[in-house]
Amino acid sequence: MSTPHNEANKGDIAKTVIMPGDPLRAKYIVENFFDDYKLVNQVRGMYAYTGTYKGHKLSVMAHGMGMPSVGIYSYELYKFYDVENIIRIGSCGGYKPELKLFDIILSENVFSESNYALTLNNEDCHVTSSNFELNAIVEDTAKEYNIDLTKGNTVCTDCFDVYMTDVNQFLGRVPDGFNPVSAEMEAFALFYNAKLLNKKASCLMSVVDSKFITDVATAEERETGLNNMIKLALDSAIKF
């Protein structure tokens, strides 16, 4: 069964899906890491692929930018395609001075001022969490491959935080003690959908900019320079 946003048939999607934001990153992943693959969705250019990685069936599907976009695609995967696990892999802004470009962050809890939960489910919810079980597998896999991993909380915004008139005013509205290490624009909707539909979600992010460093990742680096994060997600996913 297809949806208005996904032409894949139900059996075309694996139980575990890796979700980058960028469709070109989805293409890059299957072309460079999968044993074999097929394109199962290209509606609106939001590519989805299913294939095998180290002999295990996995899917990779892009989710676009922002909570409404990832909210639609992840909801449909969980609800209509019987997906059980989603790992979002994306970019983020670093909020701690010790973080460097391309450091990998595992998001534990997410705060958002969005009304996503209220609109979708009539719940006034602004903090939600990733799945502990999936996160534990990711942590163990990172140790196995000697990949440095920073765990912490994330703020999820409705606009690119770099463009905020005053980011400190926004941070002043973050709950006391939340202490975010990163900022991005999608994880809240993904985690909330997983909670609502009794599924599992995790989120890995690579730092591509920070107010503490002058360097920023180029568009090309954002597409292809995240290989450690990609490998970590894939090698974790085959253990779910």
Give a label for each model feature.
Residues 1-137:
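Metabolite-binding pocket within alpha/beta catalytic cores that recognizes anionic/polar moieties
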Residues 211-240:
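His/Asp/Glu-rich mid-to-C-terminal helical/loop segments that flank catalytic regions of hydrolases
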Residues 79, 166, 217:
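Expand to "…catalyze enediolate/carbanion chemistry for C-C bond making/breaking, isomerization
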Residues 36-42, 146-153, 240:
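Flexible, glycine/charged-enriched surface loops at secondary-structure junctions
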Residues 188-222:
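Zn-dependent metallopeptidase/amidohydrolase metal-coordination segment
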Residues 137-145, 193, 232-240:
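Generic non-transmembrane alpha-helical segments
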Residues 23, 93, 155-161, 189, ...:
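Glycine-rich beta-alpha junction loops
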Residues 127-177:
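Active-site rim beta-loop-alpha module in soluble metabolic enzymes
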